[in-house]
């Protein structure tokens, strides 16, 4: 079973959304940004999902520093919804850390999770 670390704002909501979208498919853990990023880097977690107000700043800054810029991406920003083809492309490129703005949790997380299954 794949493991996801959730960090940043709205962590509980993101965890519940993941569990509702793909019941029994993922183990979901709530961590602070540093813990989640370090666990992805060490292989203890498969993916990092972080939310903040912009989807690119606080949500991803630690992940970028620890996991690497080439393994991180923003899937939704204020006023810019997640796009299915963009998420598919990012996963195909090997991204494992995903940032999004809190306003897009309800639509972006199910879309992301369906690609990570």
From Swiss-Prot:
Pfam families, alphabetically? DUF2620
Please report the name of this protein according to its UniProt entry.
Uncharacterized protein YhfU
């Amino acid at each position: 079973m794949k493991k996801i670390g959730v960090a940043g704002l709205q962590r509980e909501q993101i965890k519940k959304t993941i569990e509702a979208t793909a019941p029994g498919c993922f183990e979901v853990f709530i961590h602070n940004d540093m813990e989640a990023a370090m666990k992805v880097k060490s292989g203890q977690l498969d993916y990092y999902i972080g939310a903040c107000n912009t989807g690119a700043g606080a949500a991803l800054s630690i992940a970028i520093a620890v996991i690497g810029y080439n393994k991180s991406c923003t899937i939704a920003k204020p006023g810019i919804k997640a796009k299915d083809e963009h998420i598919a492309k990012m996963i195909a490129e090997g991204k494992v850390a995903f940032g999004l703005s809190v306003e897009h949790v309800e639509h972006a997380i199910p879309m992301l999770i369906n690609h990570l299954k």
